[in-house]
Amino acid sequence: ATVSTLTDRRSAGAVVNDEVLEKRINWEISQTLGKNIDSHITVTAYNGKVLLTGEVATEQGRQIAVQTAERSLDVASVINELAVMENAGIGQRLSDSSLATKVRSRLVTTENVYLSQMKVVVERGVVYLMGIVTPQENELALKVASRVGGAAKVISYCDIMSAERIAQRMRDIQGQQNQ
């Protein structure tokens, strides 16, 4: 079976839903935490799976952020990678942004890995991958990302599917779009 590389492996509705999830959960967390708890939280959604990264000043703030995300509409699951610590400074954020760009550049030029099927998030030197990929694509993406200078650790939160299952999924999505 051939694996689609040009089209997103999520339905158009799932892509839009993920964008809405990110914005809504960001807003909900900022409203819930308020100005009392210092935090820098990044919300990344892929296929209904929500990844929380960043820093929160207190354990209570961390728990509130996670619970808020879990209660949000259309969330399949929440992955908590929030650290209880002082917010990373601008130097660390710039370094993370640069590392994310390097990882994306390497992935886009790697044969048999399709950046269009993944999101790359970097927080404090840790690279997180999210997407819908085959076991081979996941393994290769992990290997490529881990070889980028500055990557302290690489973690995949990708949904792993066989090439056949992805091909069927793409046919189903195409069928839905043609109706």
What function would you assign to each model-found segment?
Residues 1-179:
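N-terminal targeting leaders
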